[in-house]
């Protein structure tokens, strides 16, 4: 096709005047289709700066994918306060009548960028609130617990869930080897292997902050808090066979579902509630309330409604607004703080550090990550990609006598808690109900109905049947027996039946040959 005919086609398809193609520096270019060559069949000229620019830019279009939660999607929205929790926190975002712009990202945990959305996995559920006091992020999942309780194990856990370094293949043996040697994982693995591991869509699943956080009210009183996001579309799951079919037919099934729903005006929403624990209760509660592998019973700490979170706008550019988005549990606002949760402590460091590596030193200046309703005043400067800077006469150090920003000493004690003891490496002191398997057993026996239990048994049998080391298989049977004795016995019988069927199939195949 000639340049002229291509121009006519463009003219017909655009409503406004045709804009000339330019280089990155704004100068017009001669052709989008032909390199500068010595004759029509000759070599390309190195001084064809537009060719060089296009190829160089193309080579750099991708940034490192997230080491976890790589595959995902998201949208913009609004959070509206419908309840009154001002007695517990002074955070502006949670005051009655407040409306706050938000960004949400959903994701899977273990899969890479191109992995199918419907693989069995925990789903990420992260919300950024652009509050008048700065950005506040809740970086959670669609389950209220996690696989481990100490961040020092996180790299090992993720390695075990991804791929073998030799073959580059995912491996059931190393997954179950890690899980069964880390019994604190039992509660989360029960969620994962149950129906919660295969939601129908991101719209039809709940979300949780998972960690315990601290709220501080206007009087300085402290409380411990957990976040819950209940889907107003209901919680809907899919069968394993259906998930496998969809994985082969549409790897972007969840991403497409969310985009199409919002595009059609079918805005998904979640009712946001919290559990509140009085500060002093944590010292004597029957299990460690900061343990990320445990839930707080609603009978002890009932849900209190805070507001409604609605997604109502798709990104205009997926890369700029979703892929470059950086969420961090370190992003607190006045009235909200951390807790002694060891996993939370590790994530407070690792998330912004990952963003600096993945997006760049000045990732927080990008529009999607910068505050939308609060000013930024600090003394940071320079670094790759720096866009914003202070006035030339402004000081770049503190303290100064030139009218630069001044820290607020009244915030110094906010978010604190009392602790003592020697510096050591050890697990938390066990309390009366600090069992790794107790809540997993309760979930299986009291929450799963008979049909869900049957599906669960089939799922773990299939997953464990791929284990190649007998000692890991035996340990997996012990693991589930510790969750529930009846379940463990059924699993052993199921595995024996599956193994016998495999042997018969193998013998039949050999006989046929």
Regions found by a protein language model. Give the residues of each.
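Active-site-adjacent core segments of small-molecule enzymes
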Residues: 2-513
